C-alpha cells in the first residue's frame, strides 16, 4: 500500500485503534462521490468502468428492478421469461458475489471476462459438492 493510495476500511471489523503522530493527507482534488461513482459497496479502485449486460429470469428481474445493483443500471429489454439489464461499474468481488447469489437466475452476457470468472466460480462450486 502506497501512502498516496486511497484506502477504505470497514469500521465494524476494527478491533483496536492506535493514535499516531503522523496525519493522513487527503489530496486537495479528492472527490469521494467521483471516486466511488462506478463502485458497488465500499470497494473502489482506479480503473475503467465496464459495460455489464445481464439477462435475468422473471423472478430475479423483478427483484433487480426494485433493488438495483447500481445507479447506472438500465432496463434494456423486458420479455415474459426474462429481462436484460445494463450497468457501468468497476467489477469488484462484491459485485461478483452479488451475482453468485442469484445462482442460475442471472446470466452475464457481457463482458466475456466476467462470464469466464463466473463460469470458473460455478465449476469450483460443482467440484466442491461432487466429492
Model regions and ranges:
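Polybasic (Lys/Arg-rich)
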Residues: 37-131
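Core beta-strand-centered patch of the WYL/Sm-like small regulatory domain
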Residues: 1-44, 49-53
Amino acid at each position: 500500500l502506497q501512502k498516496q493510495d486511497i484506502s477504505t476500511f470497514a469500521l465494524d471489523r476494527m478491533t483496536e485503534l492506535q493514535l499516531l503522530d503522523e496525519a493522513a493527507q487527503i489530496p486537495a482534488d479528492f472527490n469521494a462521490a467521483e471516486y466511488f461513482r462506478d463502485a458497488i459497496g465500499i470497494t473502489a479502485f482506479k480503473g475503467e468502468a465496464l459495460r455489464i449486460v445481464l439477462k435475468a429470469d422473471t423472478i430475479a428481474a423483478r427483484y433487480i428492478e426494485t433493488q438495483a445493483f447500481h445507479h447506472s443500471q438500465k432496463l434494456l429489454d423486458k420479455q415474459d421469461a426474462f429481462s436484460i439489464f445494463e450497468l457501468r461499474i468497476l467489477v469488484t468481488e462484491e459485485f461478483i458475489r452479488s451475482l453468485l447469489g442469484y445462482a442460475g437466475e442471472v446470466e452475464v452476457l457481457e463482458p466475456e471476462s466476467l462470464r469466464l470468472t463466473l463460469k470458473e466460480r460455478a465449476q469450483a462450486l460443482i467440484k466442491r459438492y461432487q466429492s
